[in-house]
Curated annotation (Swiss-Prot):
Entries under HAMAP family matching the protein: NDH1_NuoD
Gene Ontology CC: plasma membrane
SUPFAM superfamilies linked: HydB/Nqo4-like
Family per similarity comment: Belongs to the complex I 49 kDa subunit family.
Gene coding for it: nuoD
Protein name (Swiss-Prot/TrEMBL): NADH-quinone oxidoreductase subunit D
Database matches in Pfam families: Complex1_49kDa
Length: 435
């Protein structure tokens, strides 16, 4: 019996030593987690509920976009740009077409520049509404998602009105935009859900042109933002989940190459629309919202304020576009397709159209970097041409990639539940991170 007793004591002693040795454990967060915002895989080293280290794994959505763009004529790769950050479609297009225009030495007409400015801001609101709804849903505030998507639907209809597509528009073209703004808006049709007075009410703001619709939207949208703020800004639970969480100091933001809201939320007034104006941002009036503490709550406040500023810009663009009709594409027929009326009467115009969209055009040899202030930060396109009709090199700077690199230093010491809040406030889309 004494031998059995001694063996039991030895086993208990070894088990206790093993428990003392095993302090940290590893947890996989994603890529299937609903709060991973795509295909993010985080390998977390945990000490109880506290995060000791975070190792982000990327590449699960890598599609070789840069090499695909290098295998196509310049004007055939615009559609690939939409599929990078697939929540900020036209901003991606803008960086790419600006790079081509710089190499070719052409400038889009003034009306096209105002249209681009307006749609960049429509895209910013689309992105921030998606962010607001999904981040609030991740933290347990379900109603905000429904409110945000109500306005998002209206702006998606503005995409559809100019391009025929609700997401992948391919509306921006080197030298301008695909076509001028339409005189009508898509309308709801009668169905078992929409009929009678309800249908008329839905279509009341869609009787006029796209600009009329947007003019009405800019009047109503600030009231909608007030509704979001009523639900969240002073909400006790929302503040408990975001105040003091994921603090990014200005020094840390600079070290990690952060841009956009991640930088401005820390109090750094850097915005390409002000510092390096492009399109017509130097002709419109707007402010740069800034945070103070650099935490998740500040970044929420900055994004909400940015939606208000975007609304101001859209309002100014609508007023200018209503008063100033004009061309939306350069008259350089090396890059601009012939008019459809000409193609029906002139064989040369038909041949030119076919050659333009099958072979493209040769871009003078050179290199350039073109960047825009996308909703998530600085989205840039480095473009190298060797004089052929295809790019020699395309490199895309995705803001989310730089931001994700910093996640280990930001999440250390936080609780597991705070990871969801921090990933949400990064506003990641893996189409652009993995490219």
């Amino acid at each position: 019996m004494s031998h059995v007793h001694q063996a039991g004591e030895a086993f208990a002693s070894n088990a206790a030593e093993s428990r003392q040795e095993i302090r940290n454990y590893t947890m996989n967060f994603g890529p299937q987690h609903p709060a991973a915002h795509g295909v993010l895989r985080l390998i977390l080293e945990m000490d109880g509920e506290t995060i000791m280290r975070a190792d982000p794994h990327v590449g699960l959505l890598h599609r070789g976009t840069e090499k695909l763009a290098e295998s196509k004529p310049f004007n055939q790769s615009i559609g690939y740009m939409d599929r990078l950050d697939y929540v900020s479609m036209m901003c991606n297009e803008h960086a790419y077409v600006r790079a081509i225009e710089t190499l070719m030495g052409i400038e889009a007409p003034e009306r096209a520049q105002y249209i681009r400015t307006m749609y960049d801001e429509i895209t910013r609101i689309l992105n921030h509404l998606m962010w607001l709804g999904s981040n609030a849903l991740d933290l347990g505030a379900m109603a905000v998602m429904l409110y945000a998507f109500r306005e998002r639907e209206e702006l998606m209809d503005c995409y559809e009105a100019v391009s025929g597509a609700r997401m992948h528009a391919a509306y921006y073209r080197p030298g301008g935009v695909y076509r001028d703004l339409p005189d009508h808006m898509p309308k709801y049709k009668e169905s078992r859900w929409h009929k009678g007075k309800a249908l008329k009410q839905l279509n009341a703001s869609r009787e006029g042109s796209l600009l009329d619709f947007l003019e009405n939207f800019t009047v109503e949208f600030p009231k909608r933002i007030d509704e979001y703020e009523t639900l969240l800004t002073d909400n006790r639970i929302w503040k408990q989940r975001t105040v003091g969480i994921g603090v990014v100091t200005p020094e840390l933001a600079h070290q990690w190459g952060m841009t956009g809201v991640m930088l401005r939320g820390s109090g750094v007034a850097w915005d390409l629309r002000k510092k390096r104006p492009y399109a017509k941002y130097d002709a419109v009036d707007f402010d740069i919202p800034l945070g103070k503490e650099g935490d998740c709550y500040d970044r929420y406040l900055v994004r909400v304020a940015e939606m208000r500023e975007s609304n101001r810009i859209i309002k100014q663009c609508v007023a200018w576009l209503k008063a100033n009709p004009g061309p939306v594409m350069v008259k350089n027929f090396k890059v601009a397709p012939p008019r459809r009326e000409d193609m029906k009467d002139d064989m040369e115009a038909l041949i030119h159209h076919f050659k333009l969209f099958s072979e493209g055009y040769c871009v003078p040899a050179g290199e350039t970097y073109s960047a825009v202030e996308a909703p998530k930060g600085e989205f840039g396109c480095y473009l190298v041409s060797d004089g052929a009709n295809k790019p020699f090199r395309v490199h895309l700077r995705a803001p989310g990639f730089a931001h994700l690199s910093s996640i280990d230093s930001i999440v250390r010491g936080h609780m597991l539940a705070d990871v969801v809040a921090m990933i949400g406030t990064y506003d990641l889309v893996f189409g652009e991170v993995d490219r």
